[in-house]
From Swiss-Prot:
Homodimer. Pfam families: HTH_8. Residues 77-96 bind DNA. This is DNA-binding protein Fis. The gene is fis. It comes from Shewanella pealeana (strain ATCC 700345 / ANG-SQ1). Keywords: Activator, DNA-binding, Transcription, Transcription regulation. The keyword DNA-binding applies.
Amino acid sequence: MFDQTTHTEVHPLTVGKIETASGAIKPQLLRDAVKRAVTNFFAQMDGQEAEEVYEMVLSEVEAPLLDIIMQHTRGNQTRAANMLGINRGTLRKKLKKYGMN
C-alpha cells in the first residue's frame, strides 16, 4: 500500500485495514471468524482434551492463505513471499509442508 501524502510504502495492517479492489477489509473480521471457528471446535470436543491446538489453527489458516496467494501471484514465489512479508526460502518450506510445491 502506498501513502500518497508521504510518498512511502505502508503495510496495510498498520492502518487497520487491508485494501482490496472492492474496498477495505478490516482484519477484525478475520479475527472474529477464527474466534468463532475455535469456539465451535471446542464446543464439539464434548469435554475431551484437545492437543496441539496452536499448530492445528495455524495450519488451518496458513494452508488456504498460501493457496490463495499462490493463485493470486500465478505461482510467482518471489511476489508471494513479498506479499506475505516472508523470505522466499521460508515460503518454499511452507509450500512443501502443505504439499503445494
